[in-house]
Amino acid sequence: MSNTIILSGGYKKIQSLTINSSATLKPGMIAALNSSGELIAQATEGAACEKLVILEDALQGKTVNDTYTAGTVADAAVIFPGSEAQVLLAATEKVVVGDYVTGTGVGTFQKLEAAQVPLAVALEACDLTESDAVDTLVAVRFL
């Protein structure tokens, strides 16, 4: 696992966004901006959405393992097609190289199901089907 969310390619970094009072976000999650311009977890499972991913904030001493809580600030990036990044795959999911992934509706990613919109393709296999599995970063290429 790399120590950074962005692995290669292009992106538009958006700095110092406030986390909404009801949100807890981690690097690698898919996010959205609410009507107040605050970060929230992208809330619609399998839907088309802006590819806005929470980043680690190394300038504040944060890593890919840190959590951002309500009222704090975080950096995010709009990831361009063809770019590679690590995203947070939901516990209980299993992907292999080449599987399409999409949002779960709570900020993490899942393997694409029928009638959902793909956001990225898995670049590595990850099996989180064990009962004690936790959300885990996995490398993807954004579509």
Where are the predicted features?
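Surface-exposed, low-hydrophobicity beta-strand/loop segments enriched in small/polar/acidic residues
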Residues: M1-L143
